[in-house]
Amino acid sequence: MAGATEGEDTKVIESKINELNIDKPKLEDNNEAKGNGNGNESGGDDDDDKEDDDDNDEITEPSTSTSSGDKKKKKNKNKKKKKKKIVSIDSSYPEGIFPEGQWMEYPLEDINSYRTTSEEKRYLDRQQNNKWQDFRKGAEIHRRVRHKAQSSIRPGMTMIEIANLIEDSVRNYSGNDHTLKAGIGFPTGLSLNHVAAHYTPNTGDKLILKKDDIMKVDIGVHVNGRICDSAFTMTFNEDGKYDTIMQAVKEATYTGIKESGIDVRLNDIGAAIQEVMESYEMEENGKTYPIKCIKNLNGHNIDDFVIHSGKSVPIIANGDMTKMEEGETFAIETFGSTGNGYVLPEGECSHYAMNKGVEHLKPPSERSKQLLETIKQNFGTLPWCRRYLERTGEEKYLFALNQLVRHGIVEEYPPIVDKRGSYTAQFEHTILLHPHKKEVVTKGDDY
């Protein structure tokens, strides 16, 4: 999830939940298009894995004759195999040990050699195993969900259909109805073309994915508040129009990952990213467009139940001498654009999150107080969107929601856009800074 200008065990996680006064949650069930924001949009629950995609084929049994001489044909009976329902990935990993991400050495050789040989550091890292397993479980869910998305999303689908496909898959793989235990880490980003981030459809949105669109797919998965944040860009144009910007952004992201590490200054990471990104140009209709870093979008560190936790990882040289530290978690993401390289808020808002440390703020009305309790019970400080509120049964909530925003209790995150007619792309991974090495926990075969 775009950012703009830990060794805890289960008891600590539960205490964080209790601090929010959380009871059992209620049943869980822009571009230019706008929705009404108050309807109920339910997603299908029959998602299946890619390997099950052929299970819908109709099987026709052959007709047989009923007597010698007469050839009476029986009506063919078409039988459909039932789709295989996605089940929690816990069934695949009964011991609770999930696949590790990609391990990488730290860039600073003197620090790296010390940490690799330090038994004490490695011992301390093992003591945080529950934390790492939460991240690895979330990452494995993320890989399976995006595999489903990449094999299923096609032009002609509505944004609602795409969002439901992804989000229902996250819910099913997580296998937990308590949204604060495991599930969606933040609203699914499906930003098109000049829209760089923070677009997800509201109920009633009729926007349809077109063949010439370039779509950023930003998916968040959390387990016990440990959030995996990873994004990729999809295109369907067959003439290779977007190949250059895709390559620029992907390479810039991998450069940021390579340069990240304990004691590395944030400015140095941004400078390395910028050098790679801005070495590319994109051609369209005989014109050449330089690929620019979107300078007011950043990567960010992640804390439990908090997607943007204070430190920002720039994608340009910005003079920030703050260092990354051992044990921190970062989302390394880069955005490239053929436009101004600067984004502004525009369009109907869908993304929201309750701010931290707002316990002393009093909701201005009884309705906003009741809505705030729904938010606490179901999301805590995790980001959410209007559709998620509606799954809890909330209706006619917009006035109360806007009250919470005006009083600083809830933060709104509207879509952010570059100039119209430009194209933007994004790639992102979550990295864990272990004492001896870094782990690109969300890395997969796809990106």
UniProtKB/Swiss-Prot annotation:
Q: Which organism is it from?
A: Candida albicans (strain WO-1) (Yeast)
Q: Composition bias, kind Basic and acidic residues: at what positions?
A: 8-32
UniProt protein name: Methionine aminopeptidase 2
Q: Ligase: present as a keyword of the record?
A: no
Q: Which GO terms describe its biological process?
A: proteolysis
Which HAMAP family does the record cross-reference, listed alphabetically?
MetAP_2_euk
Tell me the residue numbers annotated for binding substrate: H198, H308
* Molecular functions (GO terms): initiator methionyl aminopeptidase activity; metal ion binding; metalloaminopeptidase activity
Q: Where does a divalent metal cation 1 bind?
A: D218, D229, E428
Check the record and name the PANTHER family matching this protein.
Answer: METHIONINE AMINOPEPTIDASE 2 (PTHR45777:SF2)
The record lists the catalysed reaction(s) as: Release of N-terminal amino acids, preferentially methionine, from peptides and arylamides
Q: What is its EC number?
A: 3.4.11.18
Read off the InterPro entries from this record: Creatinase/aminopeptidase-like, Met_Aminopeptidase_Type2, Pept_M24, Pept_M24_MAP, Pept_M24A_MAP2, Pept_M24A_MAP2_BS, WH-like_DNA-bd_sf, WH_DNA-bd_sf
Q: Where is the composition biased (Basic residues)?
A: 71-86
EC class? hydrolase
Q: Family assignment? A: Belongs to the peptidase M24A family. Methionine aminopeptidase eukaryotic type 2 subfamily.
- Span list, region Disordered: 1-86
Q: Which GO terms describe its cellular component?
A: cytoplasm
